[in-house]
Amino acid sequence: MKTLLLTLVVVTIVCLDLGYTLLCYKTPSPINAETCPPGENLCYTKMWCDAWCSSRGKVIELGCAATCPSKKPYEEVDCCSTDNCNPHPKLRP
């Protein structure tokens, strides 16, 4: 009986570990944490100025990615790989 219970515990742990998916904050508003699709194991925050930057601030994009998005000269890009590691910059402590 103990062997069966131990086997079930090990199988459960292995199955849960194989099924791990990352949680990232995503835009557009409202900003919610969502499960990333398989293969997308990074969270990212991308910020840039558009034509209305002086009046409303930078455009902020949050999401999941398989690789860190390319950074253009006028953009700020941050990537991370833990659950909910990309909060909206205005909401960071």
Swiss-Prot record:
Disulfide bonds join C24-C43, C36-C64, C49-C53, C68-C79, C80-C85. CDD domains: TFP_snake_toxin. It is found in: Secreted. Residues 1-21 form the signal peptide. GO terms for molecular function: acetylcholine receptor inhibitor activity; ion channel regulator activity; toxin activity. Keywords: Acetylcholine receptor inhibiting toxin, Disulfide bond, Ion channel impairing toxin, Neurotoxin, Postsynaptic neurotoxin, Secreted, Signal, Toxin. The keyword rRNA processing does not apply. One of its GO terms (cellular component) is extracellular region. InterPro entries: Snake_3FTx (IPR003571), Snake_toxin-like_sf (IPR045860), Snake_toxin_con_site (IPR018354), Toxin_cobra-type (IPR054131). SUPFAM superfamilies: Snake toxin-like. Binds with high affinity to muscular (alpha-1/CHRNA1) and neuronal (alpha-7/CHRNA7) nicotinic acetylcholine receptor (nAChR) and inhibits acetylcholine from binding to the receptor, thereby impairing neuromuscular and neuronal transmission. This is Alpha-elapitoxin-Oh2a.
